[in-house]
Amino acid sequence: MRAFLVLGMFTASLSNAAWRDYQEARDLALDARGVNTVEIVTGAGSLEVRGNPNARKISVTAPIQVPGKNEEKARKVIESRLVLTLERDGDSAALNGYFDSSRWGWGGSPSVRLEVEVPESVGLDIQDGAGSIKIRGVLGDIIVEDGSGSSMVPARSL
């Protein structure tokens, strides 16, 4: 009887470990001199943009979550489906942070949360798929196209 109880507890703990979410974070940065607008395209996950009067670069921290996958499988999902780029295009910077959804798979949807710091004077052009948006301290023009989720832009950011 004890053997069955121990075996049951061992099996339950293994199945619990197998279904934990995999998490990692990535960082991006780009010199912001001459950048007037930051164009941001996101998918599932929240977006937070903070304007900083002393910032000389655009800094991004991107916590990534892949639910229900062990590390090896999660890394395969990240390598094959994650789009995470920060590039300059003239006087604009383009930030893309999302998982390519054209490839369907089992399990929960992976997400990438974007935490972005920009010079306070830049404008923002945001296309958001799903998730909350918080913008504060940004003095430039702000355009938001939001698929779903809440948006918060304090009056001083307008």
Segments predicted by a language model, with ranges:
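Hydrophobic h-region of N-terminal signal peptides that target proteins for export
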Residues: L7-A17
